[in-house]
Amino acid sequence: MSKCLVTVEGGLGKNVMFTSILPALAKKYDEVYVISPYYDVFKSCSYVTDAFPMGQGNLYQDIALDEDCDILWKEPYTNCKFIKKQCHLFDAWAEELGIEINTTDNTPILDKIEEEYDQCVKLAKQVKDTVGEKFIIVQFCGGQSPIAPMQDAQGNPIAYNDKQEGLKRNYHKAQQLINLINKEYPDYKIIHFALENEPSYENTTKLKVPYLVYHLLAKDAFKVVCTDSSLQHLVSGVCKDVTVIWGETRPEHFGYNCNKNICAKNVKNTQPYFRPLGTSPAIVKFPTPEEVMEVVKCTEPGNY
């Protein structure tokens, strides 16, 4: 019986995206095992035989030593075509893994959450019982590492305040967009997907729930509005109305055809992806909140 043991590194969004190409991997192997820092993502996918947390080799060493097992530790970010922005991350992964895929309608597959994680189902129900059945989900920050605990001069802990976070990016534009969404859809609650150290916004509900809960909530969400971030991957193919705001990255490399994509205008963007050349010189002109809102109101997927 053929089997493979795949290591998937990187952040939450990248790991969720990998589930999109697991059907092709499952055609090649009878059993598919995954090692990941987000192993719960892969336990939630029916194409995975089992998944293990990274760094706990005792859990999968017998599988790795099996003569019928292929060890697959491939990194799509190092793929030459991807670095040169000549293909989607799907295609880069497939090329590195030696499999063929059809990327036209790929979306993440998390079809076993209800079976594997009953607590997530209960939490999703609690959220809907609290905010109601009419809601919109938003995310405007990529995941940042939590800041270190703060102390005063005497060593006493200082309560965290997200307004102290140093890198503000386009946070003020996010509040402006939220205000526009709230004005256009006054009967809908706005659920804000963010880490504790990321900004909070007025007229939103910031939840403290496992990320898989958002995949379940997306099934009933009226709309999702987000940047190129982990939420995009958690909801694509589940929520029928997703607007994704793109900065220097592009939907033809990281996105999904089922979504509405609005891209920043790059005055200069000559650098390859994930270059060892320091900060990008790209001058990114983000769309205005008003421009994004026009896309949010549209109903058809595509690039705007």
Q: Would you name each region that the model predicts?
A:
Residues M1-Y304:
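Catalytic machinery of carbohydrate-active enzymes
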